[in-house]
């Protein structure tokens, strides 16, 4: 419960039973977005949603956010007001409140959000979803289709834009990239179903599954034909849809693992589609993608690298 909000030297809130989680994410103009492409309201939505996705991926509900802005002198006040409206939209969708923040003058426009969340309590025990809890024999699953955000980024950057792409298909891919829907309620449902291992997909399925495997000291096999990609992505990028689904990044869907009996419970608890895409295996760590004959295949992907000058969001 928020006891003291914006206006004092610090925000004050009380925490209930369970565990408190915290995350932060920064979006920098020119590296993570271009304001003329994303728009002010979508910028606010996405700045919040990248954080609520992290909290939801741990099976927690968002509580309080702190927002820090680095502003150039030429930025319009009307744009900033619209950005905050987008933030409020995102918090209304996922839960949580803005408790405070800071504003600084900066030569580069940036938005930093720090977000706290509260764990699910089952009985008297807090239950978190974690990257280090995957076990050999677990099934690997994801929420929703993958790759549309990566397709939207390609369109925004003008890379290989299909000449015959329908207007509604372009809008669908752009929305996936600029206005992602974090799976907060789904993460909480997974925690209540008994799932222990999960993370969100922000850097691409292969890259993020590799991180989960490293933390859990296990390996994984993914079947390419089971990776979910919707008809729009397949139509727009018939030669690259699998690469985008495996490595496009910024999907903000959930990746999770569980034994078969828990997976059945989790699937029944979810409102949206769940796709089982593979299985966890004993170490060595790493991810192998196979075709329908179980032969390994190589897929070129473009997962996000914070220090790679060729990686760019928008």
Please place each PLM-identified region on the residue numbering:
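Short pre-catalytic strand/loop immediately N-terminal to key active-site residues, enriched for Gly-Thr
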Residues: 38-42, 173-180, 196-197, 242-244
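Glycine/charged-rich beta-loop-alpha catalytic/anionic-binding loops adjacent to active sites
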Residues: 28-38, 121-124, 167-173
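Internal active-site segments that recognize and position negatively charged phosphoryl groups
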Residues: 135-144, 178-205
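A short, charged helix-loop
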Residues: 159, 164-181
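Glycine-rich anion-binding loops of enzyme active sites
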Residues: 15-17, 27, 63-157, 279
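N-terminal glycine-rich phosphate/pyrophosphate-binding loops that anchor nucleotide-derived ligands
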Residues: 1-57
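Glycine-/charge-enriched secondary-structure boundary and capping motifs
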Residues: 73-99, 104-111, 116, 192-314
């Amino acid at each position: 419960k928020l006891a003291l909000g914006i206006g004092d030297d610090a925000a004050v809130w009380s925490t209930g039973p369970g565990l408190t989680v915290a995350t932060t994410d920064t979006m920098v103009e020119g590296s993570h977005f271009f304001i003329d492409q994303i728009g002010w309201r979508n910028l606010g939505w996405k700045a919040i949603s990248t954080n609520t996705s992290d909290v939801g991926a741990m099976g927690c509900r968002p509580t309080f956010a702190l927002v820090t802005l680095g502003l150039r002198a030429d930025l319009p006040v009307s744009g900033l007001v619209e950005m905050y409206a987008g933030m409020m939209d995102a918090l209304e969708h996922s839960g949580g409140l803005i408790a405070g923040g800071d504003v600084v003058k900066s030569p580069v426009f940036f938005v930093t959000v720090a977000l706290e969340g509260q764990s699910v309590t089952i009985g008297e025990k807090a239950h978190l979803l974690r990257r280090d809890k995957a076990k050999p024999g677990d099934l690997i699953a994801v929420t929703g289709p993958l790759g549309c955000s990566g397709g939207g980024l390609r369109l925004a950057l003008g890379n290989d834009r299909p000449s015959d792409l329908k207007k509604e298909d372009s809008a669908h891919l752009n929305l996936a990239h600029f206005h992602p829907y974090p799976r907060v309620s789904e993460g909480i449902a997974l925690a209540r179903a008994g799932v222990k291992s999960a993370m969100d997909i922000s850097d691409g399925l292969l890259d993020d599954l590799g991180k989960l495997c490293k933390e859990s000291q296990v390996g994984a096999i993914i079947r390419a034909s089971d990776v979910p990609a919707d008809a729009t992505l397949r139509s727009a990028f018939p030669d690259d849809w699998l690469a985008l689904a495996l490595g496009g990044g910024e999907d903000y869907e959930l990746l999770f693992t569980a034994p078969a009996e828990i997976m059945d419970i989790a699937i029944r608890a979810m409102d949206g589609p769940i796709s089982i895409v593979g299985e966890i295996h004993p170490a060595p760590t790493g991810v192998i993608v196979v075709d329908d004959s179980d032969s390994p295949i190589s897929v070129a992907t473009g997962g996000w690298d914070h220090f790679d000058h060729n990686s760019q969001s928008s």
